[in-house]
């Protein structure tokens, strides 16, 4: 992908429903436009990476008036975040031999699947306790 955003931020949420709620809340702001959405929660990357990436056009107010700049926001759960941090360290900050790197990559993929199942179970318990409705759609670009 080409560099598209001028700034970035990561929002860490407790539950997957919160990821979609917060992203939709931000997307509903009248002065913010959704430019692009990549939902790696519903469509994880091959390595197991899950996160919701939304690029917004956000107003920056200067003396000459409001100018819109692209800002990427990565929304993810706590579990998605610690998984991604470890995968990033394995991928970019290690000198492990290829065999060990491959072994750990497979283990991380297995962990990603396990975490997805655990998160779904925890989300269901949370919904039952709080009577919260299911929220599961990313904002729409355009």
PLM segments and residue spans:
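A glycine-rich, hydrophobic loop/mini-helix early in the fold
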Residues: 1-8
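Intrinsically disordered, low-complexity acidic/polar and Pro/Ser/Thr-rich regulatory regions
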Residues: 118-142
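Long beta-strand-rich cores associated with HINT superfamily self-processing modules
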Residues: 12-124
């Amino acid at each position: 992908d080409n560099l598209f955003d001028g700034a970035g931020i990561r929002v860490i949420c407790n539950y997957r429903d919160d990821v979609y709620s917060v992203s939709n809340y931000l997307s509903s702001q009248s002065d913010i436009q959704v430019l692009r959405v990549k939902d790696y929660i519903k469509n994880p990357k091959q390595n197991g990476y899950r996160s919701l990436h939304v690029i917004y056009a956000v107003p920056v107010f200067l003396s000459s008036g409001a100018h819109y700049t692209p800002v990427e926001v990565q929304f993810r759960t706590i579990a998605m975040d610690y998984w991604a941090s470890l995968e990033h360290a394995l991928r970019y900050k290690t000198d492990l031999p290829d065999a060990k790197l491959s072994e750990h990559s497979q283990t991380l993929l297995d962990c990603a699947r396990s975490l997805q199942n655990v998160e779904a179970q925890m989300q269901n318990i949370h919904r039952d306790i709080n009577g919260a409705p299911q929220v599961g759609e990313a904002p729409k670009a355009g």
